[in-house]
């Protein structure tokens, strides 16, 4: 089994024909956040992905296998939510509340895209946004989520999400098993000196 252990820097220019001939490694967002992964190329070949920890692959990245061969990364279609709004203020509020939950978001022209989550869909609808479930590649804003790891930075995160889920359950008459256990017990002040590099302009 070949091992893929290197990603070519985005600023390195490769011949388009060379990249086009490379086999594709099609992965969903969660899989692209893993530095250690057993995967299958689109050709059917099984490979081992062994990249530096914290690596988050993006659609179009070019990788190098241990035999020197190139492999190109493709973002797989997956279940997502497309969020639109009748005005900029509503869409901004939607982005703000998603940011408060440290939810990975792909920002488009007049549209937000996030991984499918019925609880968040219900919350966004209540905010006045239009939410559509779709199947599409998902490539959220880079650099804000620590390689795809999502957690709360204060003790209210789990309570906030649990409350939203409770409202959803009561409204729809069923429950979900999803839980979040990464919230911290310490106070965390977000301000100009905060060095976590989060997006959405909140904290």
Curated annotation (Swiss-Prot):
The record's annotation in SMART domains points to: UreE_N (SM00988)
What are the start and end residues of every segment in region (Disordered)?
170-203
Principal location class = cytoplasm
Q: Composition bias, kind Basic and acidic residues: at what positions?
A: 170-190
Record's GO cellular component, any one? cytoplasm
Q: Name one GO biological process term.
A: urea metabolic process
- In its keyword annotation, does this UniProt entry include Acyltransferase? no
Entry's localization field: Cytoplasm
Molecular function as annotated in GO: nickel cation binding; unfolded protein binding
Keyword annotations from UniProtKB, A to Z:
Chaperone, Cytoplasm, Nickel, Nickel insertion
InterPro entries registered for this protein in UniProt: UreE (IPR012406), UreE_C_dom (IPR007864), UreE_N (IPR004029), UreE_N_sf (IPR036118)
Regarding protein family, the annotation reads:
Belongs to the UreE family.
Please report the name of this protein according to its UniProt entry.
Answer: Urease accessory protein UreE
UniProt lineage: Bacteria, Pseudomonadati, Pseudomonadota, Betaproteobacteria, Burkholderiales
